[in-house]
């Protein structure tokens, strides 16, 4: 359960600020994400890749995940997996990024930060 919450928070952190993707984005490509839990009972760290195409962030295993990377690189997150939910925000710049995330799994609450590196 801890892994699913961290996974959900991690993936969601690249959902953008509500803009819509229109054509190729400067952030298109494969990115490696690292999520670190600073508070709560979630996994201490979690790593996984995502892909950005035309500003749309995707991961094949997430059911309720959608979003876009804003042209400015600003990002905001929201993802739900079963009874787990997470949100986050931050910024991509060039080939890296960072931000914060928080979420819950039932009554358990967790939060921390994320970093991203372009492949």
Predicted feature locations:
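Bacterial N-terminal signal peptides
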Residues: 8-16
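Bacterial N-terminal signal peptides that target proteins for export
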Residues: 1-8
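Sec/Tat signal peptide C-region and signal peptidase I cleavage site
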Residues: 18-23
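Central antiparallel beta-sheet cores of small beta-barrel/beta-sandwich binding domains
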Residues: 24-119
């Amino acid at each position: 359960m801890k892994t699913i919450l961290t996974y959900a928070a991690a993936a969601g952190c690249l959902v953008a600020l509500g803009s819509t993707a229109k054509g190729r984005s400067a952030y298109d490509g494969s990115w490696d994400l690292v999520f670190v839990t600073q508070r709560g009972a979630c996994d201490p760290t979690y790593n996984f890749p995502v892909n950005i195409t035309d500003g749309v962030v995707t991961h094949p295993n997430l059911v309720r995940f959608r979003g876009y990377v804003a042209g400015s690189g600003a990002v905001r997150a929201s993802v739900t997996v079963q009874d787990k939910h997470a949100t986050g925000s931050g910024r991509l710049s060039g080939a890296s990024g960072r931000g914060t995330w928080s979420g819950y799994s039932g009554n358990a609450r967790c939060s921390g930060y994320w970093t991203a590196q372009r492949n």
